[in-house]
From Swiss-Prot:
Pfam families: Ribosomal_L21p (PF00829)
Record GO cellular component, one term: ribonucleoprotein complex
Family according to the record: Belongs to the bacterial ribosomal protein bL21 family.
UniProt record, GO biological process: translation
Entry function: This protein binds to 23S rRNA in the presence of protein L20.
Species in which this protein is naturally found: Anaplasma marginale (strain St. Maries)
Gene that specifies this protein: rplU
SUPFAM superfamilies the UniProt entry points to: L21p-like
InterPro entries on file: bL21-like (IPR028909), bL21-like_sf (IPR036164), Ribosomal_bL21 (IPR001787)
Protein name per UniProt: Large ribosomal subunit protein bL21
Molecular-function annotations in GO: rRNA binding; structural constituent of ribosome
Length: 100
């Protein structure tokens, strides 16, 4: 059985024991997090939707980390204008404990 959850404005397809990286949340390592499930799938028919908007997914915070650096480079030709800016998004690594 798997579920579709939303965290940080993005949707993730998860099963039990999956590890996912989501946008920064205000949680500490080892804390349990409850994510609202958009839809839960499974059962005898692979495409059957079991529950909509009524189940939840429980996950544990494994680590906090940062994503790879993204470089933003701005340039105006013939004006000697160049700007190089980097950004690293902070992430939270979650391990799914229970679906449904």
């Amino acid at each position: 059985m798997f579920a579709v959850v939303e965290a940080g404005g993005k949707q993730y397809k998860v099963k039990e024991s999956y590890v996912i990286k989501v946008e920064l949340m205000d949680v500490s390592v080892g804390e349990k997090v409850k994510l609202d499930s958009l839809a839960t799938f499974g059962g005898k028919k692979k495409d059957a939707v079991l529950q909509r908007q009524s189940s939840a997914v429980t996950a544990e915070v494994v680590a906090r980390c940062r994503n790879d650096k993204i470089i933003v480079f701005k340039k105006r030709r013939r004006k000697n204008y160049r700007r190089k800016i980097g950004h690293r998004q902070e992430l939270v690594v979650l391990r799914v404990l229970k679906v449904g």
